[in-house]
Amino acid sequence: TLRGFKGGTLWGVAEKLPYLLDLGVEAIYLNPVFASTANHRYHTVDYFQVDPILGGNEALRYLLEVAHAHGVRVILDGVFNHTGRGFFAFQHLMENGEQSPYRDWYHVKGFPLKAYTAHPNYEAWWGNPELPKLKVETPAVREYLLAVAEHWIRFGVDGWRLDVPNEIPDPTFWREFRQRVKGANPEAYIVGEIWEEADPWLQGDMFDAVMNYPLARAVLGFVGGEALDRDLAAQTGLGRIEPLQALAFSHRLEDLFGRYRPEVVRAQMNLLT
């Protein structure tokens, strides 16, 4: 929900599985489920603990069991570019400053940390002080994140949807990520949140697919046509969407299908809205 915690657990998702099966669902992509101080859970506090509000690790394990029993895969959302301020390393850094062994886990510009002001003295996602950016080039940070990725695959999760992976520009990290994930489960699915041209990410050494936002823009332009509130749609991050007639829509689809290798096209996370 946009504001507040309105209920709902992973136990509830498992309970609704018959309904999802009736819809023909074969995979469930969950937004972040790890312990967090935010209702949307992009402010990760503990990467090894499913939020108790959602039922904790036990609820995820049960959901995986019942989903797999019906041939349904479960994909988690991985937020590896930044953490919440409640993450243990950032908490230690706030308490101990330059003496903290975690001082190289973040891009700190000065001490003491100014974590509760509009202008933090550390790098943060889009300048939001609630989301300090991890320093992935630090070996300990890198290994921590790779261990998280591998842990949940071995737990039984079927893949990862990666939040803002382009903001971790070092391609060697994502190559190592793929090696660790595929080493735990060669069939695991890795999809990145890349909004535009994604060819560098789809060469077989990083992601299996990306979120197909260009397709979403085309579908909205065709289905919504002149009735679409394009100003509102632009606020979603999709940009300005122009109406498409059938022939133009067909040409747009042909262009999208031709951008990548056939095996990548078939694996894309296609978004219809």
Positions of the model-derived regions?
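N-terminal structural segment of carbohydrate-active enzymes
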Residues: 1-76, 81-92, 127-132, 143
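An active-site-proximal structural segment forming one wall of the substrate-binding cleft
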Residues: 19-23, 66-70, 90-92, 96-99, ...
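Short, well-ordered coil/turn segments that N-cap beta-strands
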Residues: 24-26, 68-72, 156-158, 185-189, ...
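A cross-family glycoside hydrolase active-site/sugar-binding cleft signature
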Residues: 29-31, 75-79, 163, 191-193, ...
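Active-site beta-loop-alpha junctions enriched in small/polar residues
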Residues: 33-35, 79-81, 165-167, 193-197, ...
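Conserved alpha/beta catalytic core and glycan-binding cleft of carbohydrate-active enzymes
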Residues: 86, 90-102, 107, 149, ...
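Glycan-binding loop/region signatures in secreted carbohydrate-active enzymes
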Residues: 92-141
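Active-site neighborhood of glycoside hydrolase catalytic domains
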Residues: 125, 130-201, 205, 244, ...
